[in-house]
C-alpha cells in the first residue's frame, strides 16, 4: 500500500549514535533495493580536552547581527521569532500548490520498501509573472512551508524588496530511504530532483523555473543540510547557493568516492579542490549531535561544521557560519529567529528584480 510521508520542520530522522553506513551504489537498482545496510555499531570516543577547547572558542565569536558580512559568528542564548514570520496584511500573499509524486514511476528512487507517495509543496509568490523564469529555493523535508513559516517570510521579504520574486519547492523525503537520498555523497539526488521533481513542478503549477545556478538555492537541516551542500558541490552548474542548519557533515554514509561520508567536505573536498562559485550559510548548535564525541571519530557535528567553516575561510569562500548557544540539533527556535537574515545573506548579489 502506498504511504504518504508528510514531513514537516520538526521531524529530522538522523541517527546520532549509529555506526557508519556504507552507501549503496548510486543506481536505480540499488535505490530500489532493500535500503542501505548499516555498518557495525562502534562506541563513541569521548572528546579530548583539545576538542573541548576548540568548541569552547565558538562561544566567544562575535555576535551575528543584521548586515554581518562573511565570517564566523555566534547567536543566543535567548531567542525570539523573527518578525518576518508573522503574516502581514496589506501585502500580496503567495499561494501554495501541492501534489504527490508516486515513487513507482521513479527511475532513481522507486522505494526501498515498495512504492510510496512523496508530497511536493510549491510556494508561488503573488508577484510571479507567468512565463518568466523564477529563481527558487529547493528545500529538503518540506521545511517550513506547510506551517507557513517560509511562506510568510517570503511574502514579507519579497514585498519589502529584500529578496527576489522567488518560488519555493518543498519536497518530502523518502521516509526509510531518507539517509540514502540525503547522506549519499554523490550527484544522484541532485539529478533525481532535476529530472523527476522540477519538471513535475513546472507541469503541475505552470511556473517556469530558472536554469541559472545563481538563481537556485538548496536548503536543509541535519542530513538535509548535507544534501544541500552535496547538490551544489556535485552540480555546481545548477546551484550556487546553500543554506544549512546543523549540517550532517560527518562520517555517516560511506562510499569509495567518499570514504568518510560527508566529512570529506572539510577533510578533503574543499581543501583539495579549486574554489567553486558557491555562497554558503551554515549553522551548528552548542548541544548539537555528537558534541561530546572525539573529533577523531568524525561524528561530532559541532567540530565538523567548525572545521568546514575554517576551510571555507581559508579558501576565500563567501560564507557565514553561525554557532547558536543554548540550543540543540536543528533547533526550531534558532531557525525561527535566524532564517530571514540567513536568506538575505545567501541571496546577496542576486537582483531583487530578477534576471
For each of these PLM feature ranges, what is it?
Residues 1-8:
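Bacterial N-terminal signal peptides that target proteins for export
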Residues 8-17:
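Bacterial N-terminal signal peptides
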Residues 18-29:
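Signal peptide processing junction and immediate N-terminal pro/mature segment
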Residues 31, 35-355:
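Non-catalytic cap/lid and distal C-terminal segments of serine-dependent acyl enzymes
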Amino acid at each position: 500500500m502506498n504511504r504518504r510521508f508528510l514531513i514537516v520542520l520538526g521531524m529530522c530522522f538522523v541517527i546520532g549514535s549509529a555506526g557508519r553506513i556504507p552507501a549503496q551504489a548510486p543506481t536505480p537498482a540499488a535505490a530500489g533495493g532493500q535500503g542501505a545496510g548499516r555498518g557495525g555499531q562502534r562506541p563513541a570516543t569521548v572528546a579530548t580536552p583539545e576538542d573541548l577547547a576548540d568548541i569552547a572558542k565558538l562561544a566567544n565569536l562575535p555576535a551575528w547581527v543584521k548586515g554581518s558580512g562573511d565570517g564566523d559568528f555566534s547567536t543566543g542564548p535567548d531567542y525570539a521569532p523573527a518578525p518576518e514570520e508573522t503574516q502581514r496584511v496589506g501585502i500580496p500573499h503567495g499561494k501554495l500548490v501541492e501534489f504527490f509524486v508516486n515513487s513507482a514511476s521513479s527511475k532513481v528512487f522507486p522505494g526501498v520498501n515498495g512504492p510510496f507517495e512523496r508530497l511536493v509543496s510549491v510556494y508561488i509568490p503573488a508577484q510571479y509573472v507567468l512565463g518568466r523564469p523564477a529563481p527558487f529555493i529547493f528545500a529538503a523535508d518540506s521545511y517550513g512551508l506547510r506551517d507557513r513559516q517560509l511562506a510568510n517570510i517570503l511574502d514579507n521579504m519579497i514585498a519589502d524588496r529584500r529578496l527576489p520574486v522567488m518560488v519555493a519547492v518543498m519536497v518530502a523525503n523518502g521516509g526509510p530511504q531518507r539517509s540514502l537520498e540525503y547522506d549519499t555523497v554523490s550527484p544522484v539526488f541532485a539529478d533525481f530532483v532535476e529530472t523527476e521533481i522540477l519538471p513535475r513542478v513546472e507541469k503541475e503549477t505552470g511556473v517556469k523555473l530558472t536554469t541559472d545556478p545563481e538563481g537556485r538555492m538548496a536548503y536543509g537541516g541535519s542530513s538535509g543540510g548535507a544534501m544541500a551542500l552535496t547538490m551544489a558541490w556535485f552540480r555546481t552548474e545548477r546551484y550556487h547557493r546553500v543554506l544549512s542548519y546543523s549540517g550532517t557533515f560527518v562520517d555517516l554514509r560511506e562510499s569509495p568516492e567518499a570514504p568518510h561520508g560527508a566529512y570529506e567536505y572539510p577533510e578533503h573536498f574543499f581543501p583539495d579542490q579549486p574554489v567553486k562559485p558557491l555562497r554558503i550559510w551554515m549553522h551548528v548548535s552548542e548541544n548539537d549531535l555528537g558534541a561530546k564525541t572525539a573529533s577523531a571519530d568524525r561524528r561530532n557535528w559541532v567540530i565538523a561544521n567548525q572545521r568546514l567553516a575554517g576551510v571555507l575561510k581559508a579558501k576565500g569562500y563567501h560564507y557565514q557560519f553561525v554557532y547558536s548557544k543554548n540550543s540543540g540539533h536543528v533547533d526550531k527556535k534558532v531557525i525561527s529567529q535566524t532564517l530571514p537574515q540567513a536568506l538575505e545573506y545567501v541571496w546577496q548579489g542576486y537582483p531583487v528584480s530578477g534576471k
